[in-house]
Amino acid sequence: MDAIVLWLREVFLEPSVTQTIIILSLVCALGLQLGKLRIGTISLGITFVFFVGILASHFGVTTDPVMLTFAQNFGLVIFVYALGLQVGPSFFPSLKKGGIAQNLISLGLVLLTFLLCILLYYILGISMPNLMGIVAGATTNTPALGAAQTTLHQINPDATAEMAEMALACAVTYPLGVVGVIIALALLKVMMPKVEERDDSEAPKAFFSEYEICNPALDGKSVREVALLLKRPFVITRVWHNGKVEIPTSDMILYFGDHILAVSGEEDTSQLEILFGKREMKDWNRPDIDWNSVDKQLVSRRLVITRPKLNGVRLGMLKIRNLYGVNISRVDRAGVELLPDRDLRLQLGDRLTVVGEGKAVERVAEILGDEVKQLDNPHLTTLFGGLVLGCVFGMIPFYLPGVSMPIKLGLAGGPIIIGILMGAFGPRFHLTTYVTNSANLLLRQFGIILYLGGLGLASGANFFDTIIHGDGLLWVGAGFLITMLPTLLVGWASIKLLRNRYDGTAGMICGSTANPMALDYVNSQLKGDGASVVYATVYPLSMFVRIIFAQIMILIFA
């Protein structure tokens, strides 16, 4: 019996590498199970992992500190990098369609947070180092805490006690920082539910429309010549001549009275109607369109790009229409239909809808690859290479005018920026950054859960003592105010005054507060990745500004 007790103590209580893995796994598993509980319509989800870690640490569970720090930081790096890869392809298009405005709103939230912090500094008399710890916890921004501690240490190398208090203030306010944003987002959704019904995608979508050629100037011109007349991207996918449907080539001649089916951006249909003469009212975008019946003698197949050498190649360089007499009517990328423009850069995993004669479609399938099983093979070289670049980039010091100490983005800021760049531009350099949706979700969930479990175990030992005794309750109250007030004000203004969608506003708030747990809550409530795209759009700049502001506040008020 004694041997069993000693063995159990060794496995669960004595800090070691194995014991840390066991405890961390137990905390994560129990937290995930509790995260399924709902209070009304609100569920904290994976945030429960953090609270279970705090409870375990409070009741005396200790782990190997080195292992715990590694697990926590490695989980954070995996999460932010995978998030960057996910939203990378749509990140820069989103900047052109509202991203700059979202960043300005996000900066307004950051500025309001620090103005409130200055106000509390004079009203409550809390020291600025402790306030920076409170702000770091209330906005779940641990890199800002690290930057403030570094600045304080450079000002006063003997400020060890103050630095420890800053970390404790962060730990005490962190839970309500997580929960407060989730509560604020839930309140915004309840108060303004109708905003959810509006939908306009950040990504360009393919829109089908039929036209009759009534413009005499087009009679006898080739498809290539007609395409040059309009400075907007569109593709003629089918031509009806004398009642017979054909797949057009660039040299096909169009005649007065022909009917054509074109794919373009929806906003360009009015210009196409002016060009061709008359637009038919039939809705070609209905999901119940029987394309096989439309094409009759033609074959329509969805082919998947699995040949690595095509990664990053422009669609027009393949010359599929002219060489094989087939037409590409759709390009599906991660569930988003893109306009099959000749300048579109193809990516591994893109699904192309190809229409033409059976044998020609088969030849195109051989060129594209169309072997779905190949997509299941992970491209780990690019994955780990991106992690290396992200961590290195996060350690690069940036020197700003008027700030004596260098600024670093750290493990939270560096990897997400590199992930975005890899996802957006990797294919142009023939880097295979494709990750299946399920694999990307696994990486993100695994990373953030590991981070939360480690953070809870690391910060829970003195959590309740600090709340009950000393200034703990004051810190908690100040932190909750810093979390809720700017979030509700900016969120209300974004939705009500600026007429932004809820998912974009929620993603902006999560990114501005560096709150991936709240982002996970939002994603569990909504369809699509609109919130994740906006999160990654505003996260780098808001993170950078918060780090700078934290250091400036210490320099001015400490």
Curated annotation (Swiss-Prot):
Subcellular localization, as worded in the UniProt entry: Cell membrane
Keyword Methyltransferase annotated: no
Segments passing through the bilayer: 15-32, 39-61, 76-95, 104-126, 166-188, 383-405, 409-426, 446-468, 473-495, 533-555
PROSITE patterns, sorted: RCK_C
Superkingdom of this protein's organism: Bacteria
Membrane topology category: Multi-pass membrane protein
Protein name as it appears in the record: Uncharacterized transporter PG_0562
